[in-house]
């Protein structure tokens, strides 16, 4: 199993697949409210534009995921952060980013569960 999967499984070792849905939803809601809803909008006001606000909030978002991710996975985290930021700006709502984030997290948890087989119950 790759290093990144091992690290994530250590964070959530006792979750059953049915418990992934509320966890994924809560993570998506929390992170999007903090990083896109609060931080990015405040940075836009402070910098006068969305581009710098997106970049700065992505740097913070990625840095805070560094303890649980490998360097190569951090690239994916940064790209996802930019995508969620663009969706928020484009739709003028944080709701689509929350849904996308929750669905992504749910898919990752389920893939890890399938990859782990019987060793992760």
Question: Language-model features: where?
Answer:
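Active-site His/Glu-centered metal-binding helix of metallohydrolases
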Residues: 29-34, 38-39, 63, 67, ...
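Juxtamembrane helix-loop-helix connectors linking adjacent transmembrane helices
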Residues: 1-27, 45, 113, 118-121
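Residue-level hotspots within the lipid-embedded alpha helices of multi-pass solute transporters
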Residues: 12, 24-29, 33, 74, ...
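Hydrophobic alpha-helical transmembrane segments of multipass integral membrane proteins
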Residues: 18-27, 31, 56, 60, ...
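Functionally important transmembrane alpha-helices
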Residues: 62, 70-121
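Juxtamembrane/transmembrane-helix boundary motifs in multi-pass membrane proteins
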Residues: 11-15, 19, 45-49, 64, ...
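Small-polar-interrupted transmembrane alpha-helices in polytopic inner-membrane proteins
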Residues: 50-65, 81
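Membrane-interface helix/loop boundary segments of multi-pass membrane proteins
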Residues: 30-56, 86-93
């Amino acid at each position: 199993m790759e290093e990144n999967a091992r690290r994530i499984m250590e964070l959530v070792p006792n979750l059953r697949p049915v418990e992934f849905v509320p966890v994924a939803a809560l993570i998506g809601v929390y992170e999007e409210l903090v990083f896109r809803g609060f931080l990015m909008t405040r940075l836009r006001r402070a910098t006068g534009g969305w581009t710098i606000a997106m970049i700065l909030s992505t740097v913070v978002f990625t840095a805070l995921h560094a303890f649980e991710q490998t360097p190569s996975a951090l690239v994916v985290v940064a790209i996802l952060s930019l995508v969620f930021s663009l969706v928020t700006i484009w739709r003028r709502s944080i709701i689509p980013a929350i849904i996308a984030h929750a669905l992504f997290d749910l898919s990752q948890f389920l893939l890890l569960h399938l990859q782990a087989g019987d060793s992760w119950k």
